[in-house]
């Protein structure tokens, strides 16, 4: 049994720590369940969890074992697990769950707010963390559950939830009266979901995708961007149009260049991810100084989710997101290639490719345990 851990200050460093499932079983208390993690997805989204692990609290969900120095953490992942031991009435051995897990073989959960469809983990150390991450879905409560979709669900649902929230926030704000939406790191899966959502809205402004030269052909093939511009051709961005930027990259050079060109036409910049997380500590330079920080802000999807659940109710929120997800999942079949990684040793070999951005944009990694 193993737990995959990441160095908090250098995401390229990782280690495997042996874990004791027998001890976890022996220590199981009344009200607890033990689950065996079956599979999980790993994407640039997980890298963002690490890059903002301290500021937002992602390192706190699953405290790393054998970590007296505090140097190591568990990057949260989305995936599936089965109950292997239960001291909770109504949760049976063998039941399948979808949710937020550590990259490990097993996890102890303390279910609360149990319903036929879901429960919340009531572990004390998670009480102050965003509720959306503490929610576990019971596959036994889904009439339309299709196990063949597990890989795509683990890969895309966490990302497309953010895509949905971004679409909704932009629509709710009337696109800030912009004439174009500029999406940075247009090949990222969250960006693709956003662009596809905007393409479904007849009232949306034109959508411009910025990406690397190597990913340009792929992004163009998706057909959801009105224009695709590579990072070495940023002068092609029409700086005369009032613009909203949605940044998935954290790339200070790209942001500084485009902000500087747009000037007053840069209405707002929504910062979402950090596919270029290594740029965040780059010493200030003239380009970085051009970033218009007073009109930039970090978008935290869990807060938007809680707002919309309050506005629409849980059922109303679920209906809207389910429809969005179903459309995106169907579209993903034309471009997504799922790669299975067998176990933690194999995952260790490809982990850094994701962290440093070497993965093909149409590839999705699912680790099978």
Name the predicted role of every residue range.
Residues 10-40, 44-46:
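A short N-terminal beta-strand-loop micro-motif at the entrance of redox/enzyme domains
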Residues 226-236, 300-301, 338-343:
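Short acidic-hydrophobic, aromatic-tinged amphipathic segments that line or gate anion-handling sites
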């Amino acid at each position: 049994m193993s737990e995959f851990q990441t160095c908090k200050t250098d995401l390229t460093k990782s280690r495997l720590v042996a874990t004791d499932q027998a001890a976890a079983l022996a220590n199981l208390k009344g009200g607890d369940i033990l689950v065996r993690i079956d599979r999980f997805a790993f994407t640039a989204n997980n890298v963002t969890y690490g890059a903002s692990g301290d500021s937002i609290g992602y390192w706190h969900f699953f405290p790393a074992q054998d970590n007296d120095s505090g140097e190591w953490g568990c990057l949260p992942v989305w995936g599936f697990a089965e109950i292997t031991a239960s001291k909770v009435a109504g949760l049976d051995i063998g039941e399948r769950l979808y949710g937020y897990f550590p990259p490990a073989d097993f996890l102890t959960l303390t279910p609360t707010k149990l319903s036929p469809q879901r429960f919340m983990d009531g572990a004390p150390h998670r009480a102050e963390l965003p509720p959306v991450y503490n929610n576990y879905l019971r596959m036994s409560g889904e009439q339309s559950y299709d196990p063949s979709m597990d890989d795509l669900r683990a890969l895309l649902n966490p990302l497309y939830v953010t895509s949905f929230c971004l679409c909704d926030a932009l629509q709710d704000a009337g696109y800030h009266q912009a004439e174009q939406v500029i999406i940075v790191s247009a090949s990222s899966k969250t960006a693709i979901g956003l662009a596809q959502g905007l393409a479904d809205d007849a009232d949306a402004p034109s959508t411009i995708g910025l990406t690397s030269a190597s990913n340009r052909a792929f992004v163009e093939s998706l057909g959801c961007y009105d224009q695709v511009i590579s990072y070495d051709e940023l002068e092609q961005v029409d700086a005369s149009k009032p613009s909203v930027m949605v940044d998935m990259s954290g790339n200070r050079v790209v942001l500084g260049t485009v902000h500087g060109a747009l000037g007053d036409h840069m209405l707002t910049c929504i910062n979402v991810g950090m596919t270029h997380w290594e740029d965040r500590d780059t010493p200030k330079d003239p380009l970085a100084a051009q970033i218009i920080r007073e009109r930039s802000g970090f978008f935290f999807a869990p807060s938007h989710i809680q707002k919309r659940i309050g506005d629409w109710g849980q059922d109303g929120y679920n209906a809207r997101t389910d429809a969005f997800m179903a459309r995106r999942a169907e579209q993903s079949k034309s471009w997504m290639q799922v790669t299975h990684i067998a176990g933690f040793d194999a995952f260790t070999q490809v982990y850094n490719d994701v962290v440093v951005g070497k993965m093909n944009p149409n590839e999705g990694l699912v680790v099978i345990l």
